[in-house]
């Protein structure tokens, strides 16, 4: 598929503290956060003018699902726009709390684990053709996804009985299956629940729940861009070496616990290979595939360049070469500088605090944004485009139809209901339009519905 629909869903961790102590329960904080949303949307589950969905997920985690995007750079922009929307809710919630005499700071963390060991996710969505063999897709994809954390892990200080260790991925400890239809109970690598949000005869939605949430725009670009290239190769029938893992769940933890990428994992064939070797295999295939097919877009070239350079840097143990572009490396360097300066072990509570503060989405407070201000975080999006993305949908996908419909209905104060595929006016006629093609950004039926308001 040369043109693909992408979407990202990020759940955020939430807390409210006063002088270091927890002030409100997550449920209470979430209520304050969503008060403004509920006041205009009459619900804590709403679609926005930019085509995105914002809602309160299980366990009081705010979740933002980007609108449908058909290129990875735009996806990164819209994911960051979601961050900004939530930052706005955070500022609003703090103001309301102070007005009610409750002193405290509200924090939203774009990470995947809390101090109690709970995990919440970053889900990636890729539209794939229905006619392909899904089991073959999963077989080729799983070794890639298990080792992909070397490219796009968010990094984590993991407390173990033998002291704290730095891991590549936050999510790796919480994955229990390879392929499954559950997302919370068993946490698979690929979720098979078949909800295409599109014409089910033509498409299915590949739902990857193994990845970490990313603060870094370049890491996000690499994560989704490399996965897209692997999918394109599978769809084109590219012959791949069998890299099936003997035990993907053990392997994902082994890879996460080794920042050198050299630790060998067992393959089903009885051979052993390191995460670097597995990734190198996919990378070289992707380079060859793009050359043979003449795939030469700026995004693809940037993805391939960063993918190769990341593998080279890890192999050479020269992480400075990717020190502004890969989340787990950026955080690791930050922690190592701090530890050296204050002569601390990895187990020190201050180190855990810095680990968390990297993911604080408040731009005046979060450590990732401190790096960005200092020019130590490479960019993909720009601030103007991100600001636009808060209210303007992508113009080349179905999200445009949804966003335009919502904008018009709100301006006309009309009661409406929308989801990913339906647009409905709640009037006597109950007029509804079903939009099954996520690639279509122009539709006479929708225009008629909008014009009739």
Curated annotation (Swiss-Prot):
Top-level EC class: ligase
Pathway: Protein degradation; proteasomal Pup-dependent pathway; Protein modification; protein pupylation
Reported function: Catalyzes the covalent attachment of the prokaryotic ubiquitin-like protein modifier Pup to the proteasomal substrate proteins, thereby targeting them for proteasomal degradation. This tagging system is termed pupylation. The ligation reaction involves the side-chain carboxylate of the C-terminal glutamate of Pup and the side-chain amino group of a substrate lysine.
Disulphides: none
Record gene name: pafA
Family: Belongs to the Pup ligase/Pup deamidase family. Pup-conjugating enzyme subfamily.
Keyword hit for Magnesium: yes
GO biological process: modification-dependent protein catabolic process; proteasomal protein catabolic process; protein pupylation
Record keywords, A-Z: ATP-binding, Ligase, Magnesium, Metal-binding, Nucleotide-binding, Ubl conjugation pathway
Single GO MF descriptor: ATP binding
Catalysed reaction, written as an equation: ATP + [prokaryotic ubiquitin-like protein]-L-glutamate + [protein]-L-lysine = ADP + phosphate + N(6)-([prokaryotic ubiquitin-like protein]-gamma-L-glutamyl)-[protein]-L-lysine
Residues binding ATP: 53, 66, 420
EC identifiers of the protein: 6.3.1.19
Binding site for Mg(2+): 9, 55, 63
Originating organism: Streptomyces coelicolor (strain ATCC BAA-471 / A3(2) / M145)
Keyword Magnesium among UniProt keywords: yes
Catalytic residues, chain numbering: 57
Protein name in UniProt: Pup--protein ligase
Other facts noted in the record for this chain: The reaction mechanism probably proceeds via the activation of Pup by phosphorylation of its C-terminal glutamate, which is then subject to nucleophilic attack by the substrate lysine, resulting in an isopeptide bond and the release of phosphate as a good leaving group.
